[in-house]
């Protein structure tokens, strides 16, 4: 597939190189490996902050285009795959960014990290096809040692300014401990705060990484952030029609899921628990941050969401 397909759904006409090479990590390597898929074309929120019998209102706002930013292959499928598939089925275009290729994601010390990374990239491509993303980028940062530094933020700003999403889905950077039952992986935390920092202020500030603007990647304002795996969720997306597709996408990650039926049962249970909060079969929850909103689109529900300071 050529460069024309890569620009599907983009607002800008700036060309972008397509990287189709398999993973070949070397220290200090930078630059995304974008793998486009030939599917899909490019399209509103309801959030009720009032608790009545613990029942929330389903969140219905939908972006024309959105980007999911995660630390590893499989994070997006354990995370917002149901939301992504639901939005894509309704007409949105989604792009997935994996900061690492998961080369440290194994329990066998004799496993070749490069071979594992190649396998996990291919697993993620298969899963992304199931969900329906336009494409996926691998930034080839070191698994287990991801750092929110300027090079990573520049790569993420490049991704955002290229695809120009209305919404970005990423981890909640405030979460170090999940409730009282688990520690949030260091790469998840680094990817989350890097994504937030890339969205605001860097992606929207033409003075940040000015060489990007000079190369044709104009500043871009992401309108909303959806923070997954949050300890403070305040919106729930109905993913009932896409729950099976989320499980199908997870099946692609054979190198990471050694008890698939047990894992899938827990995932379905979690979606069902979240769905009960809004009266549907399955849902995924987020902490919503509204960065920019057109006045005519504002609803009572959205008015309750935190709004970041404008640049």
Sequence positions of predicted segments:
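Metal-dependent de-N-acetylase/amidase catalytic core
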Residues: 50-67, 149-311
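Extreme N-terminal basic, low-complexity initiation segments
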Residues: 1-15
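Short linear segments in intrinsically disordered or otherwise low-structure-confidence regions
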Residues: 9, 28-29
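Active-site rim/loop-helix segments in enzyme catalytic domains that contact anionic ligands
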Residues: 39, 46-164, 306
